[in-house]
């Protein structure tokens, strides 16, 4: 994990929680609506902060939080019950109806820990509001991105709050800038990795997880690094996904209706476990399936198989071969292989 630089505040700072509250913000006498952001992105959308900003808030019983989506990449605002099995995003891979818990719950729903509350997938400009009628400490998650989490501490009205909205706004601004700066640095690493991994290597996204006391976030580059590559007939190009917990695809030709097809795919697999396709025409359709490393080693769960993080294609004829990530082409994740005689 990357360490967060110049963090404004961290949960668990080296002084008692009672002291924090004693110096904090008193109850105004009426329920308040707090504001937070969901995600951040660069102007070209290629650098994404998969984060709740801020990802830790203290509020009073009866208060409301309104989350505003700030990216073209989709996210959800989700509160699961403790012990609830995390649902998939969609019924069929990346298509079909939204599963939710079940479905999306109405904007302005109450969450007290007894039933799940979730937005539908949100994109830039959309908002979702949750009311908190009961004191407690609640985990916030995004159903799209497994390492995007936060927390909400709901205190009795008799207790003061440690921070006000201005604090959270400043914190969010700083964290947004840091995550996008981290992503800019990752782009250089991804380009270097592409040059070092193989003679004809492409990095299919790169990311790094950061954390505060309230949860985890992800600085991500959603681009093919080495996106335009020149090779000769008979050469093999290798794509490697360096994005922790984020799936990508390498898709030539017609985009499949479902980027998460049934497995195993009808593709040859090299002795080192890498899917390997052969393409002989720019009109040929080939899909890698999702590649990435979502699995986390967790005590008490069965050992997961080795992740598919690479994909290879051998080109047997000259031409211009355009490809996309079927999950993120809408934010510009595209590439080209120029095959020369």
Locations of the language-model features?
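Bacterial N-terminal signal peptides
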Residues: 14-24
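Bacterial N-terminal signal peptides that target proteins for export
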Residues: 3-15
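Intrinsically disordered, low-complexity regions enriched in serine, threonine, proline
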Residues: 1-2, 24, 220
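Extracytoplasmic copper-binding redox domains, predominantly the cupredoxin/blue-copper superfamily
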Residues: 27-341
């Amino acid at each position: 994990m990357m360490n967060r630089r110049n963090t404004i505040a961290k949960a668990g700072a080296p002084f008692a929680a009672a002291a924090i509250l004693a110096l904090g913000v008193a109850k105004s006498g009426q329920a308040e609506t707090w504001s937070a952001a969901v995600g951040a992105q660069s102007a070209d959308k290629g650098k994404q902060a998969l984060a709740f900003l801020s990802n830790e808030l203290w509020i009073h019983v009866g208060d409301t939080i309104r989350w505003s989506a700030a990216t073209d990449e989709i996210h959800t605002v989700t509160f699961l019950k403790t012990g609830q099995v995390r649902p998939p995003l969609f019924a069929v891979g990346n298509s079909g109806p939204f599963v939710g818990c079940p479905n999306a719950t109405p904007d302005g729903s109450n969450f007290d820990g007894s039933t799940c509350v979730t937005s539908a997938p949100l994109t830039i400009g959309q908002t979702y509001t949750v009311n908190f009628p009961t004191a407690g400490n609640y985990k916030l998650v995004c159903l799209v991105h497994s390492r995007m989490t936060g927390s909400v501490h709901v205190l009795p009205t008799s207790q003061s709050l440690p921070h006000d909205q201005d604090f959270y706004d400043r914190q969010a601004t700083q964290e947004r800038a840091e995550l996008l700066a981290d992503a800019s640095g990752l782009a250089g690493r991804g380009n270097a990795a592409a040059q070092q991994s193989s003679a004809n290597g492409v990095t299919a996204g790169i990311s790094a997880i950061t954390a505060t006391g309230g949860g985890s976030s992800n600085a991500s580059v959603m681009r093919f690094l080495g996106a335009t590559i020149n090779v000769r007939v008979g050469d093999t190009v290798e794509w490697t996904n360096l994005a922790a917990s984020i799936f990508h695809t390498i898709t030539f030709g017609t985009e499949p209706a479902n980027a998460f097809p049934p497995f195993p795919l009808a593709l040859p697999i090299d002795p080192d476990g890498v899917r390997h396709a052969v393409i002989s025409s720019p009109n040929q359709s080939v899909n890698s399936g999702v590649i990435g490393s979502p699995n986390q080693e967790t005590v008490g769960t069965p050992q997961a198989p080795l992740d598919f993080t690479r994909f290879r294609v051998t080109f047997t004829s000259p031409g211009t071969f355009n490809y996309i990530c079927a999950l993120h082409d809408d934010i510009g994740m595209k590439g080209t292989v120029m095959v020369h005689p």
